Regions:
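Helix-rich C-terminal or lid/interface subdomains of diverse kinases
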Residues: 40, 214-217, 222-310
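Short, contiguous pre-domain boundary segments
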Residues: 1-3
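Hydrophobic packing residues in well-ordered alpha-helices of helical domains and bundles
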Residues: 65, 117-121, 170, 258, ...
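Active-site acidic catalytic loop and adjacent metal/ATP-binding pocket
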Residues: 41-47, 53, 85, 174-224
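An alpha-helical support segment within catalytic cores of ATP-dependent transferases
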Residues: 9-30, 90-94, 114, 123-192, ...
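ATP-binding pocket architecture of kinase catalytic cores
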Residues: 6, 29-143, 150, 157-160
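Short glycine/proline-enriched coil/turn segments at helix->beta-strand junctions
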Residues: 48-51, 77-81, 204, 229-233, ...
Length: 310
């Protein structure tokens, strides 16, 4: 598996230890394990039993460190655990950007198509929406029309690959989403990257939510994406009923799920098997391709393809 991004910075355990020795020497000799991740923005290492080190892979993710630190300080009252920022490091040792140490959250990442607590996930989304809606716009809290050109390019690109893909079906889903009435209510608090690898399960229950750098306020549709990137036809209605949403918001949420999948699949199909498998699951749930084989669990970080992913 090659690099995901052309401008990706080389990161290894030796670099992480040097950074720790300069910033937090008390942690520098703890066991350090790279995490197999579905994320696309950070390299993530488990540090000892109770910490993780998160290092942006590209300049595009460098601003996430400060943003996520602030967001995580505003999430009191949620029904699940979120990480706590234990330290922030400065550029050093040839590494050019800020980096962070977070607390470790116990749990296994959710996996698309496997049993998932649809009702608890909906309760989390509702609880997040109930928090004060102050802060910057969420990464995906904007109108779908803002990513229309990129989605259409990605659909055309997918038709030129060997991926089983029904472009006509995808365009129909996209047209319905674009045609749905826009959100006219007050902005809502959003995570905006509720990928399975960011949802931690323990004993079959939702225990934690990771990777808050894309969070903010906006149209609540984007936090409906687990209905397609995690759940199936059997559990989607449970999620929809519990989250409580109108037809227009549901259609826009389906549009966000499609947009992410069609852009991620051609970009990551040879470099990130976790994200690629998830995109295939989404497209199958939207009747745009055959049902794929089951994926495996990986802890993720924020999912974005620089300059392409909505």
């Amino acid at each position: 598996m090659g690099r995901m991004h052309a401008d990706e910075h080389a990161i290894d355990a030796a670099l992480v230890r040097r950074l720790l020795r300069g910033r937090s020497p008390e942690w520098a000799d703890l066991p350090l394990t790279p995490l197999a991740s579905g994320g696309t923005v950070n390299a993530v290492y488990r540090l000892g039993a109770g910490l993780t080190v998160r290092l942006p892979l590209t300049a595009g993710g460098a601003g996430d460190v400060a943003k996520e630190r602030h967001i995580l300080s505003t999430l009191d009252g949620l029904p699940v655990a979120v990480p706590v920022v234990a330290a922030v490091g400065e550029p050093a040792e040839g590494y050019p950007w800020p980096w962070a140490v977070h607390t470790w959250l116990d749990g296994e990442p959710a996996v698309e198509g496997r049993p998932a607590p649809a009702r608890e996930l909906a309760e989390f989304v509702v609880a997040l929406r109930a928090l004060p809606a102050d802060g910057p716009p969420a990464y995906r809290g904007k109108p779908l029309s803002s990513v229309d050109a990129g989605v259409r390019r990605a659909i055309a690109e997918l038709t030129r690959t060997d991926e089983p893909f029904d472009a006509e079906a995808a365009l129909a889903v996209w047209a319905e989403a674009l045609g749905a009435p826009q959100w006219t209510g007050p902005p809502c608090r959003l995570h905006s990257d509720l990928m399975p690898s960011n949802l931690l399960l323990r004993d079959g229950r939702l225990a934690g939510v990771l990777d808050w750098a894309t969070a903010g306020v906006g149209d609540p549709a984007c936090d409906l994406i687990p209905a397609w990137n995690l759940l199936t036809a059997a559990t989607r209605p449970v999620f929809r009923d519990a989250v409580g949403t109108d037809d227009a918001t549901w259609a826009r949420g389906r549009g966000w799920a499609l947009a992410m999948a069609v852009i991620q699949l051609p970009y990551y199909r040879h470099t990130n098997p976790v994200i690629s498998a998830n995109a295939r699951h989404v497209l199958a749930q939207l009747s745009c391709r055959p049902v794929p084989r089951a994926s495996t669990a990986r802890r993720g970080s924020s999912v974005r393809a620089p300059n392409t992913t909505p």
